[in-house]
């Protein structure tokens, strides 16, 4: 079961190990944006995969997802999406004890230490928050910066933000495209309004663009404390929230102050610190001096309400096979 964002990558991480293990697969496309996978069905046919090995279906939760996840012939369910739907899938799958892999949301931290290459950190923050219009489960939406470098980092981020072009993704000059639904924009606006009432300040952005389509400005919110609503709400849009810290211990505590645990990023030139802090951050992925790099050979998945199990990497095939112990008596001697 795949969402509407990053459909081909998320399908591939599920389909490849399943095919390698000799399984037949049903892919449930998002009802919001099914066209990519419907076209992919043609490519499956052209590739020579026999009919019935891979099926792609579309439909809503009631008519498609629920019948699939409760069907007795379904042995395994791999889901990418939100925690609310995931909890229902776990309940549904318990009817038949189907094995599940859940890759859910996140409020990933990007921690920038005082010894970091600030330009590199700015690149990571831009890519981690405004790439794909912020519609990414690993978006680094909690930017946690040492207080001694906050001013210069914010200045560099603001300058870079001025050069970001938001518009039609078919135009070559566009950097940030539209959001998928108006519902996302409404959630962003509601969250920003609440954050400002709690004392947060908009550094740049913060508004819906006055043009046709679901466009929202790349946005940075300066948060005075960790209770600001934008630090806990997954908005799935181009919005980052900024916090400052004074020492390493506080940075780790801030990074782990979330119910999620999918991605994380560290920017530092101290290799010992990078290893030390990455071990203490409760997240399934940690990028050091980079952000949002993905490879099919690297395991992908999270902790806590970001889900469990892993996709991609050699271990992913283990979820699609079963271990069987077979004892064979090759002796003609009577059983003792």
Place the predicted regions along the sequence by residue.
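Short glycine-enriched loop/turn motifs at secondary-structure junctions
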Residues: 51, 104-106, 137-138, 172-173, ...
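ALDH superfamily catalytic-core signature
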Residues: 84-225, 288, 335-336
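Gly/Ser/Thr-rich beta-alpha loop segments that engage phosphate groups in nucleotides
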Residues: 24, 32, 61, 83-84, ...
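Structural detector of well-ordered beta-strand residues that form the stable sheet scaffold
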Residues: 19, 26, 55, 78, ...
